[in-house]
Amino acid sequence: MNKTITPSIDSINRQWYLVDAENQTLGRLATEVASVLRGKNKPSFTPHLDTGDFVIIVNAEKIKVTGKKGMQKLYRRHSGRPGGMKVETFNSLQERIPERIVEKAIKGMLPHNALGRQLFRKLKVYKGSEHPHSAQNPQVLSITTNELVK
C-alpha cells in the first residue's frame, strides 16, 4: 500500500519569479500567477499547505482587458458607513492605482480562507519596471496570454 507523502515546511523550496504584465490580458495572467502562488506547478503540491513560490509583477499599469471592459468593468468598495459605496471603472482605477487591479484579480482566484491570505502575501505588484526584490534573484516567468488582444 502506498502512502501519501506530505512535505514538511522545511522541505519546501521557494523560488522568486518575475512577471512582466505589459500587454498581457488580465484574467489570463491572473490564473497563471495564482497557480504559481498556490504551488500547482510543483510535484510536491498539497492542497492544504502553502507550497507555492513568490511572484513579482511589474508594469501593472500596462495590463490589458478585452472588449469594452475598460469602460464597463466596475470596481466597488465600501467604507462601512451608510452611503459609503464607491464605484470606479477599470480605466479610472488603472490611472489611479494600477496595482490594485492585478491584486484583486489574483486574490479572487486564491482560496478564500487563511491559506489564501497567506498565499496572497507572497504576491508583489509594482507600477513600472522597477522593484526592490533584486536581491532574491527572481527568475523570469514568461506567460504568453496576449494572443487574443488586438
Curated annotation (Swiss-Prot):
Coiled-coil positions are none
The record, for Gene3D superfamilies, names:
Ribosomal protein L13
* Family annotation (InterPro entries): Ribosomal_uL13, Ribosomal_uL13_bac-type, Ribosomal_uL13_CS, Ribosomal_uL13_sf
Transmembrane ranges? none
Q: Does the keyword Ribosomal protein apply?
A: yes
Q: Which domain of life is it from?
A: Bacteria
- What protein name does the entry list? Large ribosomal subunit protein uL13
Q: Which organism is it from?
A: Prochlorococcus marinus (strain SARG / CCMP1375 / SS120)
Q: Which gene carries the instructions for this protein? A: rplM
